[in-house]
Amino acid sequence: MSKVIGIDLGTTNSCVAIMEGGEPIVIANAEGSRTTPSMVAITDSGERLVGQQAKRQAVTNPENTLFAIKRLIGRKFESEAVKKDIAISPFKIVKADNADAWVEVRGQKYSPPEISAMVLQKMKKTAEDYLGETVTDAVITVPAYFDDSQRQATKDAGKIAGLNVLRIINEPTAAALAYGLDKKKDEKIAVFDLGGGTFDISILELGEGVFEVKSTNGDTFLGGEDFDQNVIDWIADEFKKDQGIDLRNDKMALQRLKEAAEKAKCELSSSMETDINLPFITADASGPKHLNLKLTRAKLEAICANLIDKLEGPCRTALKDAGLSPSDIDEVILVGGMTRMPIVQKRVQDIFGKVPNRGVNPDEVVAIGAAIQGGVLKGDVKDVLLLDVTPLSLGIETLGGVMTRLIEKNSTIPCRKSQIFSTAADNQPAVSIHVLQGEREMAGDNKTLGNFELTGIPAAPRGVPQIEVTFDIDANGIVHVSAKDLGTGKEQSIRITASSGLSKEEIDKMVREAESHASEDKKKRELIEARNQADSLVYSTEKSLSEFGDKIDAAEKQKIEEGLAALKKAMEGNDADAIKKASDELMQASHKLAEAVYAKAQPAGEEQAGAAAHEGEAKGEKVVDADFEEVKEDKK
């Protein structure tokens, strides 16, 4: 079996590592660097340049040099994040036939996975040159808060690059593997990962070779590229004030600004002041113009204050989801080049109340972790168990527009959950399964991942057919959903593909709205549940009354009819408590009728009912009623 390589496919830079002699080793590229710029350029002759070669010619070829493509992967063209990128990008971002965001270079369209594949091919070649043999198997990392479509698109990029992607793992988890492999003591750690394009925070428990992720959060549109953009805007604004020329309108000048901004940002991590000198940046009728500015660390921190402030929210949420306070965290591991900024380190210290651990190389640690995971999968690394989580809840839409969750956020993956649903109407021949991802109570407030139908259900009263819906998340975090009619054995399934992913803005919006609308959502849900239960009660009472009404006296029958009328009236309103009260009163009034039904049914059905009850107990099934109203069993 050939070697398994670990690849950190980064927004700004990528890195590749392997396990050799039981130790992870980062491999230097042909240019002698241990990291490779995630850049691709197409020259006049159609030649593809990747990495440092692409970066070197970016100033003279800005429209055909692609960078930060990871921010487009698995995203729709119409998303706010993509619109923001279009406004500042020197290259052309276009709408694909499937509504995804693609790029156009020299008249040809490329999908983000295609461009990412070019970077992956460079990493593959780097490993092959070092090993002297062909490499096919790889573990590739993604931000922990990447959604289903982004993970799928990353896997597709690996396939395009000729790699057999054994596993997609989360970047903070990979970093934790690299940090904790030789640690013997049990500890709780926070991995703070601020890279070129994304921000992740993961809380893990380490002990006895087990790496268990307790929670994860983040922002897939916050990273070094955004810090660079703030600096670019400041430089351009200063120059415009001085010369009256907006350099953002000149793509070649803009590319020079980008390089200068990145260089200044890096220099200010170790010095208090830097000069930005760009001679012959542009020209007008009066002659050439030169740019010369001083930028201090304090000014840089002020320019980027709005981005620094965005780091705290996800950290607090991750701690809350893990059920921990900052004082419970033993170590905070810094990952990603942006964590070299002193202001970022200070903010991390303020959030967690302790000095962060800088014992790992923030640029290489993720690739090292990916290589370790490759070693685990190949069997070279023993006694290591990695337990990762899914970042968002998954479920389906049920009667009344409610989202019924099958898998909660921060559930350990891989995982599989099933629940039994039924039909909402008599003789219903098909059910539509609406697959959702998000944290809101109502289906319409969450993100649709897909829709499919289970047809050919035999005619039967509502509530009788049993439809088992199963959610399956694999170790890569990719979702599969199936629905099966337990009566006929007929099954239909859907694999959520890259075209139906979820953007980061939508995730953030969902979480924020979920918090602000929590009580409102709860009331809506309670009202719908009360209505659903009342509807079932009305249906069953009317059915029993028509069949067994002659077995009870007229006064009892009148009480039931009055109770039915009162409940129907209550159901027209929006008061859940009133509906529950009317339901209870109808149930009280129906006691005599229930006795008549029971007396009639017992002799004929006692044996059968007993058997069915035992079978249900054995399976421990949780049945949800036809109209997708949950019928809760007592907890066992």
Curated annotation (Swiss-Prot):
Name of the molecule in the record: Chaperone protein DnaK
Swiss-Prot/TrEMBL keywords: ATP-binding, Chaperone, Nucleotide-binding, Phosphoprotein, Stress response
Composition bias, Acidic residues: 626-636
Lineage, top ranks: Bacteria, Pseudomonadati, Thermodesulfobacteriota, Desulfuromonadia, Geobacterales
Family statement drawn from the similarity comment of this UniProt entry: Belongs to the heat shock protein 70 family.
Biased composition (Low complexity): 602-613
Location of the region described as Disordered in the Swiss-Prot/TrEMBL record: 602-636
Expression induction: By stress conditions e.g. heat shock.
Residue(s) carrying Phosphothreonine: T198
Composition bias, Basic and acidic residues: 614-625
An example molecular function term from Gene Ontology annotations: ATP binding
Transmembrane segments: none
Described function: Acts as a chaperone.
HAMAP family registered for this protein in UniProt: DnaK
InterPro entries reported for this sequence: ATPase_NBD (IPR043129), Chaperone_DnaK (IPR012725), Heat_shock_70_CS (IPR018181), HSP70_C_sf (IPR029048), HSP70_peptide-bd_sf (IPR029047), Hsp_70_fam (IPR013126)
